[in-house]
C-alpha cells in the first residue's frame, strides 16, 4: 500500500481551501462574539460514556472507540461537540443565569453522512443555556442565518419543525409511545406505508394525527391546516405558535414548515430549524432546542443552539479568500528588515523572494512590491 494514501472519506486540506475555511471561521466566531458568546474548547477525546449521553444509536454508531492505555477504559473521538458544551455548562461553569457559548473544532465520524461527505468535519456552533423562552430560539435562528449570510450565501431555505408535536401525540397514547422509535424513523423518512402499518391499530384520533404529519408541509400557511387536523392539546398549540413566530422572524429567506422533518439530532425537545441552499441536497446548518441534554451531567438546563460544518460551508461559499500581498526582496539589510517588520505590524502580508527563486506561487496575489528608491524602501504597485 502506498504510504501517501489516506482512509476513505478522509482528505487533506490544501492551502486554498484551508485559507477559505480559516477566513470563514474567523468571520463566524467574530460574529458570535458580537452577540456575547464566549468560546470554549472541549477535548477531542473523552470517556465514551460522557460523549454518548444523548444522541441515540446514531451518535454511538458514528463515534470512533479506542482503549485508554492509562486507565483501560473505553475512550471515544467526539462525533458531535454539543454534548461536550452541555457538560461544560452543567458541571464546570455551573452558572445560574443565561450562558452563551460557542465553539469550533474537529469531529470524527466512523461513517460518512453522504456518498462524498468527509468523515472529518470542522464543526462550528453556538449555544444558549438557561432560558426556556422562545426568545433564545429566535436569537439562535437569527445567528444561524447571520452566519450563512456572512459566508456569502443567498437563496436560503429555512425548514421548521417542532419535536413537541410528536411528543404530545405519544404522551397521550401509551400504545403509540411503545412504538416511538419506529414512528420516529417512519416520519423522518416519510415512509407512509410503514407509518400506516404502525398506526393501524391505534386510537382514531392518534392515528389520524400521526398520519397527517407527513402531509403537513409547505409555507407558513400550513400551520393553519395543522391546527385544524391535529388534536387541540396545549403542547401542540404552543408548538405551532412557536413555529409561527420563528417563521415570521426569518426575513429574506424562504420558510417551509415540515412537521415530519425529525431527522438530525435525536436530543431535540422543541423547535428545530434546518437551513438548505439551492443546488445542495443536504442541510448546510441545523439547530434547535434540547432542554434535557445536560441531565446526564447532573444539571438539566434549558438549551438551544445550532451547528454547521465549516468544510462544507467553505465548499459552497462564494467568498474570495485569496489575500493580497507585498513582494519584497531578500537581503541582509537593516533598513529592509525594518520596513518589512513595519508593514507586517500594520497587518500587511509581506513575502520575501528567496535567492534563486523567481517564480512566486499564486496563493497570495502579490499586487505590490517593496523597492528601494533614493535610499528608502517604499511600496509600489506591481
From Swiss-Prot:
Keyword Cell membrane attached: no
Residue stretches in coiled coil: none
GO molecular function, one term: histidine-tRNA ligase activity
GO cellular component terms given for this protein: cytoplasm
Subcellular location: Cytoplasm
Pathway the protein contributes to: Amino-acid biosynthesis; L-histidine biosynthesis; L-histidine from 5-phospho-alpha-D-ribose 1-diphosphate: step 1/9
Keyword Amino-acid biosynthesis included in the entry's annotation: yes
GO BP: histidyl-tRNA aminoacylation; L-histidine biosynthetic process
CDD domains documented for this protein: HisRS-like_core
Keywords, alphabetical: Amino-acid biosynthesis, Cytoplasm, Histidine biosynthesis
Family: Belongs to the class-II aminoacyl-tRNA synthetase family. HisZ subfamily.
Quaternary organization: Heteromultimer composed of HisG and HisZ subunits.
Leftover remarks: This function is generally fulfilled by the C-terminal part of HisG, which is missing in some bacteria such as this one.
Physiological role: Required for the first step of histidine biosynthesis. May allow the feedback regulation of ATP phosphoribosyltransferase activity by histidine.
Protein name: ATP phosphoribosyltransferase regulatory subunit
Originating species: Burkholderia ambifaria (strain ATCC BAA-244 / DSM 16087 / CCUG 44356 / LMG 19182 / AMMD) (Burkholderia cepacia (strain AMMD))
Gene transcribed to yield this protein: hisZ
Amino acid at each position: 500500500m502506498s504510504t501517501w494514501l489516506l482512509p476513505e472519506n478522509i482528505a487533506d486540506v490544501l492551502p486554498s481551501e484551508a485559507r477559505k475555511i480559516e477566513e470563514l471561521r474567523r468571520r463566524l466566531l467574530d460574529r458570535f462574539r458580537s452577540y456575547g458568546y464566549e468560546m470554549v474548547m472541549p477535548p477531542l477525546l473523552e470517556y465514551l460514556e460522557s460523549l454518548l449521553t444523548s444522541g441515540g444509536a446514531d451518535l454511538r454508531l458514528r463515534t470512533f472507540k479506542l482503549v485508554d492505555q492509562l486507565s483501560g477504559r473505553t475512550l471515544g473521538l467526539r462525533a458531535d461537540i454539543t454534548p461536550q458544551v452541555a457538560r461544560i455548562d452543567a458541571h464546570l461553569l455551573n452558572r445560574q443565569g443565561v450562558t452563551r457559548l460557542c465553539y469550533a473544532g474537529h469531529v470524527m465520524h466512523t461513517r460518512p453522512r453522504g456518498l462524498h461527505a468527509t468523515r472529518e468535519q470542522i464543526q462550528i456552533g453556538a449555544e444558549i443555556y438557561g432560558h426556556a423562552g422562545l426568545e433564545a430560539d429566535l436569537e439562535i435562528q437569527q445567528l444561524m442565518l447571520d452566519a450563512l449570510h456572512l459566508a456569502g450565501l443567498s437563496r436560503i431555505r429555512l425548514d421548521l419543525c417542532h419535536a413537541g408535536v410528536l411528543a404530545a401525540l405519544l404522551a397521550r397514547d401509551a400504545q403509540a409511545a411503545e412504538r416511538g422509535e419506529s414512528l420516529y424513523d417512519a416520519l423522518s423518512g416519510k415512509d407512509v406505508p410503514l407509518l400506516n402499518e404502525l398506526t393501524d391499530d391505534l386510537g382514531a384520533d392518534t392515528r389520524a394525527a400521526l398520519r397527517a404529519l407527513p402531509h403537513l408541509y409547505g409555507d407558513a400557511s400550513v400551520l393553519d391546516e395543522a391546527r385544524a387536523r391535529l388534536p387541540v392539546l396545549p403542547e401542540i398549540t404552543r408548538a405551532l405558535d412557536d413555529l409561527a413566530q420563528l417563521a415570521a422572524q426569518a426575513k429574506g429567506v424562504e420558510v417551509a414548515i415540515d412537521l415530519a422533518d425529525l431527522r438530525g439530532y435525536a436530543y431535540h425537545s422543541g423547535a428545530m430549524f434546518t437551513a438548505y441552499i439551492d443546488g445542495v441536497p443536504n442541510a448546510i446548518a441545523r439547530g434547535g432546542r434540547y432542554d434535557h441534554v445536560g441531565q446526564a451531567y447532573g444539571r438539566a438546563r434549558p438549551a438551544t443552539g445550532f451547528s454547521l460544518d465549516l468544510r462544507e460551508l467553505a465548499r459552497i461559499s462564494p467568498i474570495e479568500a485569496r489575500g493580497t500581498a507585498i513582494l519584497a526582496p531578500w537581503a541582509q539589510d537593516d533598513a529592509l528588515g525594518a520596513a518589512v517588520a513595519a508593514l507586517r505590524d500594520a497587518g500587511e502580508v509581506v513575502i520575501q523572494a528567496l535567492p534563486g527563486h523567481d517564480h512566486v506561487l499564486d496563493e497570495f496575489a502579490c499586487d505590490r512590491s517593496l523597492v528601494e528608491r533614493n535610499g528608502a524602501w517604499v511600496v509600489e504597485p506591481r
